[in-house]
Amino acid sequence: MKRRHWSHPSCGLLLLVAVFCLLLVFRCSQLRHSGDGAAAAAPDGGAGRNDGDDVDERLVELAAVDPAAMAVLQAAKRLLEGNLARAPERHRDVALRGLREWVGKQERFDPGVMSELVELIKRPIDRYNGDGGGGGEGEGRRYASCAVVGNSGILLAAEHGELIDGHELVVRLNNAPAGDGRYARHVGARTGLAFLNSNVLSQCAVPRRGACFCRAYGEGVPILTYMCNAAHFVEHAVCNNASSSSSGAADATAAAPVIVTDPRLDALCARIVKYYSLRRFARETGRPAEEWARRHEEGMFHYSSGMQAVVAAAGVCDRVSVFGFGKDASARHHYHTLQRRELDLHDYEAEYEFYRDLESRPEAIPFLRQRNSGFRLPPVSFYR
């Protein structure tokens, strides 16, 4: 019988097709494995990412875990059980009422709080100023422009004072000095809202004497305070005692209101900063984001006062300008103190990444994107 040779044209064609198929399978396998490697090496770990989406869903889940907030809430509940015994009797009822309301809002995470900040923050200020009680022109509107002035020593390297004072609302942090001849050309002279960490409030109020020395910018400047310790509702009651925030009418003799940030805003800020910190950890160490807690004191980790002030301003202003955020090797940590070292409980580098996104690509910020919060961020500019 005659032997069939493989040199026949049809056989050669079959062989070429077979080789092509093998190469195609090999190439697809390579692409799949290289894709896995790219995901593992991606800045935010790659896991849980949707096509065309910069947000890592696994990091979103991890950011929701907040032991520090849980510890504060548990301590608050114990204070309620003990009827806030540390409060002087004349301030106890007011302090307890504020604490109960605050605890009652703790259980719900709601990025939609951004759309309520005009009502929660600006409306009480308008009422105090006599602008928001009768359906006037200013009722319900946002501030046209806001300047948030941080405390970084880099402020002294520029002269932004006049630019800062040109904004409708000027927000300052933790009673940093302003307005005198030494700092005015750098930080401005006007203040429309003081943002205080409640630790600062606790240091300048004296409950036993019923005295409040926390109004560094004058009795007519409202205070917005974040409660980092539920016991500080006593100091809040003392400082808010003379304000007219509950009367609904302006009073020339009354001090401006002391407003407590809504716990939903606190939780939103905490998740945003932890997300950016987790992402930074995974990118810089190459380790799984789940190991983040080993490198940080998770029970102490917290966002900075400045970060929350910026987010709050984004909720009540049509345009936000930010000054004095950042660092330089030659500058002090705070422009008005000798402190040079940053606080370990904050991840400032992660916050700087958030600020860069806020300025240049706000759509990439988890929790604050319009589809998450129903809120559109205003333009935010950082002056350095």
UniProtKB/Swiss-Prot annotation:
The gene is STLP3. This is Sialyltransferase-like protein 3. Its main location: Golgi. Possesses sialyltransferase-like activity in vitro. Transfers sialic acid to the glycoprotein asialofetuin. The transferred sialic acid is linked to galactose of Gal-beta-1,3-GalNAc through alpha-2,6-linkage. It comes from Oryza sativa subsp. japonica (Rice). Residues 27-384 are lumenal. PANTHER family: BETA-1,6-GALACTOSYLTRANSFERASE GALT29A, SIALYLTRANSFERASE-LIKE PROTEIN 3. It comes from the Eukaryota. GO terms for cellular component: Golgi membrane.
